[in-house]
């Protein structure tokens, strides 16, 4: 995309959207809503969805006066901490769902979605996780809200149950092909259960995310430790290669005969989302992942700075994933030959993601609790 002046009515990310990529906002907070930022991103930039996360929400609750009035209303001792946290998170997601409702309607429910995390302490108990998903979605009370569930062993079971119960699910923390296969299986089994229970599959949506920046950072650190020319030449290659492999798996899965029967019943494919797209290497373009992960039917999640950089300029070169499966497998073969253990890295990153989510959730509880106490004293 050039730096030319844009014509009226042309979205800033029109070329990305034209390639079938849906740009979503990462780290949604009330500040994005109250300031009109999300409204402008939808109208001018072409943002088509958003995700909330507890780390961003905790920081916002601590620093943004926009939460003060609600926290004062939640200061009663009759409201437990879990209900207060859920209420704060649900308020933001509900507002964002309303802002994105026209996109949701225009895309027949495929975009215009907003996803939010569940308390990770429930992730090891499938029954509790499903109950929390139901409570959370009821609190938001919007058809375009989704719940996030990490693709741990227990999380996979919860994903299957939630989809079967008719809940829209955003599957997170998928780093390996084996785990992605489990997520696909869980989605398919959930759809079969939903269909057997008489649910309308056309209302069920799901996305599954690969945190590309986290994967590259871990692999590149190991390559730099090796320090050989062959190792250093592979820096920055791992995540895009894995994304290409995932897309081939996606294409095979949703192009098969079994899926065609589900599609005939109204089911939607579980879309791939690229997350952790913030580039911290000063020698790389801020939009590197946005430009390198382009293919039809996918989602790219971006923080506000990355969105702004992409809106200013993108060097697009068409589809970057389709038909590159062989080259992707070759990258990972070379990495394995160097001693880079892909499955081991995936397990490590999955564990760190779950631990990080738990820590962020503790911070969110503390921030909401402090805000309630401050409001109670004033």
Model-assigned labels for residue ranges:
Residues 1-36:
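N- or domain-start disorder-to-order transition segments that initiate the globular core
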Residues 266-376:
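Flexible, acidic glycine-rich loops studded with aromatic residues
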Residues 26-30, 55, 117-123, 150-154, ...:
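Active-site beta-loop-alpha junctions enriched in small/polar residues
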Residues 56-59, 63-158:
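Active-site beta->alpha loop and helix N-cap motifs at the rims of alpha/beta catalytic domains
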Residues 165-305:
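Catalytic alpha/beta core domains of metabolic enzymes, predominantly
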